[in-house]
Regions:
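A short, N-terminal "cap"/entry segment at the start of jelly-roll beta-barrel domains
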Residues: 1-43
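Short histidine-centered beta-strand/loop micro-motifs
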Residues: 38-40, 48-50, 58-62, 79-80, ...
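Glycine- and acidic-residue-biased ligand/ion/polar-headgroup-sensing regions
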Residues: 52-55, 62-77, 84
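Residue-level marker of beta-strand positions
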Residues: 56, 86-87, 105
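Ligand-binding loop in jelly-roll beta-barrel domains
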Residues: 92-111
Length: 111
């Protein structure tokens, strides 16, 4: 395999995510009661999602891997409720509806 020059870019750093550092970030509307802070666009994409209490994202099909880390609060789907510190991996071909009864912040990666 020939060597390929890749463009040089600086890494993206977000500090304090385990201690509420998202409070200073400018989230944007995503779905009713859910806001997004895009970190990396394209594939894979990376973002923070902020769910207000009672907010939900309708059922959707994953066309690639989706990985979620719950940073604060709890998030639920039909398979269970995931507390702070939980990592959920949803492989390609899976689907679910997601909600948060009490509100949460998640770090999410998807392809």
């Amino acid at each position: 395999m020939p060597w390929k020059e890749l463009p040089v870019t600086d890494p993206i750093r977000l500090t304090g995510l385990l201690t509420g550092g998202w409070d200073k970030l400018a989230f944007q509307p995503f779905a009713e009661g859910v806001e997004i802070y895009p970190i990396l666009e394209g594939e894979p994409a990376l973002a923070l999602l902020k769910y207000e209490p009672g907010a939900a994202v309708p059922r959707h099909l994953h066309t690639g891997l989706e990985t979620i880390c719950v940073l604060s609060g709890s998030q639920s789907d039909e398979h269970g409720t995931y507390q702070t510190g939980t990592v959920i991996a949803n492989p390609e071909g899976t689907s679910h509806e997601v909600w948060s009864d009490d509100g949460c912040i998640v770090l999410i990666q998807w392809n």
